[in-house]
Amino acid sequence: MRIAPYGTGSVVKTAIFCFVIFITALFLPQPGGVILATAALGFLLFTLYFYRDPERKIPDGKGLVIAPADGKIVLKQTLDHPVTGPGSTLVSIFMSPFNVHVNRIPVDGLVRDLRYHEGKFLMAFDHRSMTDNERMEITLDTAAGPLWFCQVSGFVARRIVCDLEAGQEVASGKRFGMIKLGSRVDIVLPSSIQIKVKEGMKTTAGETILGQTGGF
């Protein structure tokens, strides 16, 4: 099982901690020692599961915009956006602690701008989190026009990882970061993109097609 590079440090620290707990448990009276050792093993296995980073098959096709995150679409609405213009579509993907948390680039492009905002830590399924929570906003210049998406931390997730830089060329489906322990990713698509998803649908980062346009 591949472990996300963004989580290597956390996995190593957890493994060391659990090893110490396991050794300590060997010298404790039973069944307390067994219970403690089992809990440590369970915690280590959950950590490995959380930081898993499976390979994804990027769909072939012209003009595809793919999901940047695993999860469930909790909001889809039309709006006017300062980056993507009038008639844009917002798609919000909620990521539970049991989803893969590695984020992927939705479409080929050039990173125009990155903006980090400090903020609150409301529950990620609370739509106020889009504007009130800690977040990283990313603007891509694409062949179909500008596209905006945002990593939003949640009540449990308080660590956003984004390894992009302004001016960087990026390819659809490539890993660019993660949000730890439950969160959401919002993406705003310009009106030139035909939306292929609806609220309630589950998404797979790097595979689920959110929309398509012939303008690429």
UniProtKB/Swiss-Prot annotation:
Localization, UniProt: Cell membrane
Record's catalysed reaction(s): a 1,2-diacyl-sn-glycero-3-phospho-L-serine + H(+) = a 1,2-diacyl-sn-glycero-3-phosphoethanolamine + CO2
Any one Pfam family match given in the protein's UniProt record, by short name: PS_Dcarbxylase
Site (Cleavage (non-hydrolytic)): G182, S183
Protein modification: Is synthesized initially as an inactive proenzyme. Formation of the active enzyme involves a self-maturation process in which the active site pyruvoyl group is generated from an internal serine residue via an autocatalytic post-translational modification. Two non-identical subunits are generated from the proenzyme in this reaction, and the pyruvate is formed at the N-terminus of the alpha chain, which is derived from the carboxyl end of the proenzyme.
Chief location bin: membrane
Family that this chain belongs to: Belongs to the phosphatidylserine decarboxylase family. PSD-A subfamily.
Function: Catalyzes the formation of phosphatidylethanolamine (PtdEtn) from phosphatidylserine (PtdSer).
Protein name: Phosphatidylserine decarboxylase proenzyme
Organism: Chlorobaculum tepidum (strain ATCC 49652 / DSM 12025 / NBRC 103806 / TLS)
Gene from which this protein is expressed: psd
